[in-house]
């Protein structure tokens, strides 16, 4: 028997069907590649694309939109441009570039997109962040007041760095810039500080040697290495520092402390210049584009010490700049000097004369780190900078003067010994309490009767002696962070006690 449907039933069924009817339409804006040269493609037809948006090519390659022109857009290819041809389709993603962040990245070597390149398998990270983020404003920040110990005597005593500071490391090639960075990373062991080392445009063998050195000292466990090598495209080299600081911001925003090294921003500027010239942007001084200052300022402003309300986390930045024949007045060096809170200037002549780290104390400065220096170091190194400056002056004068009075001679002798005190081998950072002890010995004349050539031996033997017999003095300096009258007396007694047994 056939079922009879009433007219109102039919209309209600049709109405229900109409209400539940959905058209699943996937609307994509698709453009076409009209030109490609040196990793930069010109794409036609993406009328609504955003600056900084990620686009996808037919062959799966990804690109980043940098130029928005009237008819076309300039897209840099992220990775290799092999396989991209004219006429190929390009699809919008609607998303800006992101990179993975989090604890899962520690101990790994990644490219600027967050993909692992160390052969240790995939990285488990739950969070992604935009590579370009706005720097914290004035009210979100707090003044730099906590010390960041580098373990390098000359820096901690004369050019102190605080958490949240930007301190430039500048010098010619082969003057020990990367060594300073590695030393500082090694010295953060046990300090609950995450280190990020960004290698830009370096040889893969150099980066491999750095990774090996960090592994040997057990420092890779709390370090992330972001590598855009010399063989990688200019686009990846350009993105590397921004990816690195995005990873650091995750720790800063969670109330933790991070240190980031950009090695080096000279190559970063060169990569940006290469991209800009191919994108036909007008060149300026030294053929760099007009916004090369903003390139570095927006990067370095993201290093900050956050206020207590925002968790009091910090990012300390150490940008590295390579100069040509000591020319600090070139375009990129002067730009970065003006952005940072001080600079550590390394000199070839000092390096070649055996003074290592080859820090020029006269030209190096820390504009905000003094507020972060612990009192014990301030007490022993108060006049050290002036003493070394007058020593250099006297040294130049003594070359021409045959007979010197006793005071001048004693100043020269003291200066020579202080220069020896500040010398240090690579990859052996010195804890702050031991720095205080040896600088105290030099500043108070305990090394005046020790031959300058024996100062290093004196220090090497003094430290085990202090640990064995006067550990309480080292503990007092470490815990109180100052030299009390009692500690001062104990320290003098310890050094005098050691000198009786020292055979220089």
UniProtKB/Swiss-Prot annotation:
Produces ATP from ADP in the presence of a proton gradient across the membrane. The alpha chain is a regulatory subunit. The lineage of its organism: Bacteria, Pseudomonadati, Campylobacterota, Epsilonproteobacteria, Campylobacterales. Its EC number is 7.1.2.2. It comes from Sulfurovum sp. (strain NBC37-1). Keywords: ATP synthesis, ATP-binding, Cell inner membrane, Cell membrane, CF(1), Hydrogen ion transport, Ion transport, Membrane, Nucleotide-binding, Translocase, Transport. It catalyses: ATP + H2O + 4 H(+)(in) = ADP + phosphate + 5 H(+)(out). Pfam families: ATP-synt_ab, ATP-synt_ab_C, ATP-synt_ab_N. The gene is atpA. One of its GO terms (cellular component) is proton-transporting ATP synthase complex. The record marks 364 as: Required for activity. Its main location: membrane. It is an enzyme of class 7 (translocase). The keyword Nucleotide-binding applies. Signal peptide: none annotated. F-type ATPases have 2 components, CF(1) - the catalytic core - and CF(0) - the membrane proton channel. CF(1) has five subunits: alpha(3), beta(3), gamma(1), delta(1), epsilon(1). CF(0) has three main subunits: a(1), b(2) and c(9-12). The alpha and beta chains form an alternating ring which encloses part of the gamma chain. CF(1) is attached to CF(0) by a central stalk formed by the gamma and epsilon chains, while a peripheral stalk is formed by the delta and b chains. It is a peripheral membrane protein. SUPFAM superfamilies: C-terminal domain of alpha and beta subunits of F1 ATP synthase, N-terminal domain of alpha and beta subunits of F1 ATP synthase, P-loop containing nucleoside triphosphate hydrolases. Belongs to the ATPase alpha/beta chains family. The keyword Repeat does not apply. It is found in: Cell inner membrane. GO terms for molecular function: ADP binding; ATP binding; proton-transporting ATP synthase activity, rotational mechanism. This is ATP synthase subunit alpha. HAMAP family: ATP_synth_alpha_bact (MF_01346). PANTHER family: ATP SYNTHASE SUBUNIT ALPHA, MITOCHONDRIAL. InterPro entries: ATP_synth_asu-like_sf, ATP_synth_asu_C, ATP_synth_asu_C_sf, ATP_synth_F1_a_nt-bd_dom, ATP_synth_F1_asu, ATPase_a/bsu_AS, ATPase_F1/V1/A1_a/bsu_N, ATPase_F1/V1/A1_a/bsu_N_sf.
